[in-house]
Amino acid sequence: MLWRGSQALRHFSTSRVYFKNKLKLALIGQSLFGQEVYSQLLKEGHRVVGVFTVPDKDGKADPLALAAEKDGTPVFKFPRWRLKGKTIKEVAEAYQSVGAELNVLPFCTQFIPMDVIDSPKHGSIIYHPSLLPRHRGASAINWTLIMGDKKAGFSVFWADDGLDTGPILLQRSCDVKPNDTVDSLYNRFLFPEGIKAMVEAVQLIADGKAPRTPQPEEGATYEGIQKKENAEVSWDQPAEGLHNWIRGHDKVPGAWAEINGQMVTFYGSSLLTSSVPSGEPLDIRGAKKPGLVTKNGLVLFGNDGKALMVRNLQFEDGKMIPASQYFSAGETSVVELTAEELKVAETIKVIWARILSNTPVIEDSTDFFKSGASSMDVVRLVEEIRQSCGGLQLQNEDVYMATKFGDFIQKVVRRLRGEDEEAEMVVDYVSKEVNGMTVKIPYQCFINGQFVDAEDGETYATVNPTDGTTICRVSYASLADVDRAVAAAKDAFENGEWGRMNARDRGRLMYRLADLMEENQEELATIEALDSGAVYTLALKTHIGMSVQTFRYFAGWCDKIQGSTIPINQARPNYNLTFTKKEPLGACAIIIPWNYPLMMLAWKSAACLAAGNTLVLKPAQVTPLTALKFAELTVKAGFPKGVINIIPGSGGVAGQRLSQHPDIRKLGFTGSTSVGKQIMKSCAVSNLKKVSLELGGKSPLIIFSDCDLEKAVRMGMGAVFFNKGENCIAAGRLFVEEAIHDEFVTRVVEEIKKMKIGDPLDRSTDHGPQNHRAHLEKLLQYCETGVQEGATLVYGGRQVQRPGFFMEPTVFTGVEDHMYLAKEESFGPIMVISKFQNGDIDGVLQRANNTEYGLASGVFTRDINKAMYVSDKLEAGTVFINTYNKTDVAAPFGGMKQSGFGKDLGEEALNEYLKIKTVTLEY
């Protein structure tokens, strides 16, 4: 085989080109899929000797033809291969001239004669988008969804004289998600994996390893092609059947019904998993029950009483509208264009004219699709407008919803003016009458400024730890949801208003958000109490109060982030100036724990936003609700779409995807050390993203005999029992000097007996429930281990006998350095006390530092010299002297050793979300 020099150079480092067998291929087909298969086959070193595709349409070549022509590959564009049942001689001769060893048909709409199919040495292989023998025929993907199949996939098979009946070479499958459409299934799996499989199949043939597995007749089905005339909805079926029919026809040919005498097509169907919202009835011919036009879309009902939601409607003239606007679709007034807007309209008219090259004049009545445009042209139109109109962001659906030029210009102008933004954010709430108020709780993913269901419709229950009941079901973010959220954050940073906003205006938004949080502090604190078990009075002061303070503090930093000038050696006789700039990183990910759901959000996101970044935040799976309420407030504060995205779900799915995502430039994490290590590894392997980790702790608190004992008892209890012990800096081990040890323990037990354990919404409650059942069970096991190892259980150690996840405040003494209790964090209301000899300062310091953790620490003594000596020697990110838990928004917070690195709070936190650029100029 002869290779051009450029080919050899291009593949020099890719040994697979030289050490694998390669074939001469004829590619027969069309479309972007065909183009990608063609390109990948070339990269693998195969030689495409000819491309056989469809003729140009309206002067535009198919993507496969364009790619091949650009490479100099022979391209043949035949309108047909046969005439009156016989192969056209000229076509056959042209095909034979290329000398192919294998025909590859990635996507082909033409009938290819069998003499062509069988002509090459290795025959022909075809891609088919179903798991053959199921769904033979041209509408295979549609029928996969229409029939409610749980598995979808594709087959690469050897062509024979039957209809999709040839032997199987390979197959790949995937799960069908509840709300998959033809497009989502194709884009997620059939397109990308299909390309890989076609290339793999060709290589298997080249290596002589390709199987030929006969198709079984058992389970074989053949369905006809779906066209508009046979896509009408049949209403006598369950909601799931209606949903499958609609999504199986989305976008082509489109499932439809007759409404008010005209054909209306449904798009964007999803099954309703919550209660049916209120709306205005809409009669639909043939439907047993009227639909409901709601603020979220059109609700349709199956014969089983269950419901589905349709997002968009399309009328006979091609115009598409949000289904929620059905009764107001014709009420929009025409806007008068300014001189500047007229210039934009002329620019867009030129773009339309280029795309619709066969349309002599573009007029207001010119319809984009009726003038010959296809779905590919929609993408081109959106991209050309973005490039030519100052980065104006349109969506593909904007074109479908305004197909005539005049309507399209009106939509563009409204977008430029901000008039097409929703007047009121659409939020589905779960409402609770609790704590003397009506609490409204969002429960969906918050992506790109909208509350939306998870793409696959999955939800999970979030539980009230006070009584173990379900508060509501929350959207469970999938990988696709994470990707959408990251894309929104990336776009908002690179192309949106946020990236162009003045720093002072950014600060103004953050101040406004802090004010809204303060105005809604009672509701936020109530949600925090319901979802995390936080005592309401503590939630008001700390969980919510410090969150408000954090946003105000960092709002003030927005316009004070600055670089410096640096004197360097001059390039004499010229001069140099060197300065640094601090710049945001881009789209950041934040993963927070469950102990302070809103405060942990604030600690990280406020600094991230002040630095100018955008973010995707994953709250803890068990405590997502205050984060979602916070998302609602960000919209009310005026934050642009995509700046803040909240995705509830699991760490194993959503969290892992964020740590691996190539478009995330920084990840801030608070959680366990073991998970932190995995995150750091994923961040390094993916794209070496910047990381800050606030991890586990076993914070020592040393209490000397010369302390203020009353204060030491009070604050020592707070160091352990504050927030039910679910506190990252909780004193994990108390070292009490021998002279006061017994009295200290006695006083602590006396004070514990005064504590009221109960409903966190009761204003007199001191100690609420543990966050969730699994954590409570872990704490009980922790206590059991302590007893088994010989520690003395002085008080508690049991679950409180009442509904919910309540645990008694617990005290252990006699804890030796080798014991499990001395080494491992409980993260609960368990005081672990060890005695140390009188006057043995260095000895107790050695014991206190004998841990891999280094988050916080404390010392109580009246001797300032002793206090300062101890603070110097303690290996921890924070040292408290004669106090504990005294954090402040202006004081940097973070650990060392295996408690992590990086800082929250204070000016230092900003540096976690900034990069420094050095600029040197000569003059």
UniProtKB/Swiss-Prot annotation:
Its EC number is 1.5.1.6. It catalyses: (6R)-10-formyltetrahydrofolate + NADP(+) + H2O = (6S)-5,6,7,8-tetrahydrofolate + CO2 + NADPH + H(+). (6R)-10-formyltetrahydrofolate binds at Q110, F111, I112, D164. It is found in: Mitochondrion. NADP(+) binds at residues 592-594, 618-621, 651-656, 671-672, 694-695, 778, 825-827. Residues 438-923 are annotated as: Aldehyde dehydrogenase domain. Signal peptide: none annotated. Phosphopantetheinylation at Ser-375 by AASDHPPT is required for the formyltetrahydrofolate dehydrogenase activity. The modification Phosphoserine is found at S31, S650. Residues 339-416 form the Carrier domain. One of its GO terms (cellular component) is nucleoplasm. The modification N6-succinyllysine is found at K60, K681. The modification O-(pantetheine 4'-phosphoryl)serine is found at S375. InterPro entries: 10_FTHF_DH, ACP-like_sf, Ald_DH/histidinol_DH, Ald_DH_C, Ald_DH_CS_CYS, Ald_DH_CS_GLU, Ald_DH_N, Aldehyde_DH_dom. Disruption phenotype: Homozygous knockout mice lacking Aldh1l2 are viable and fertile and no embryonic lethality is observed. They do not display phenotypic differences in terms of growth, food consumption and development. 10-formyl-THF and dihydrofolate accumulate in the liver of the knockout mice. It is associated with a decrease in levels of NADPH and ATP specifically in the mitochondrion. Male knockout mice accumulate more fats in the liver which is associated with impaired beta-oxidation of fatty acids. The record marks D164 as: Essential for catalytic activity. Keywords: Acetylation, Mitochondrion, NADP, One-carbon metabolism, Oxidoreductase, Phosphopantetheine, Phosphoprotein, Transit peptide. The active site is at H128 (proton donor), E694 (proton acceptor), C728 (proton donor). In the N-terminal section; belongs to the GART family. This is Mitochondrial 10-formyltetrahydrofolate dehydrogenase. The gene is Aldh1l2.
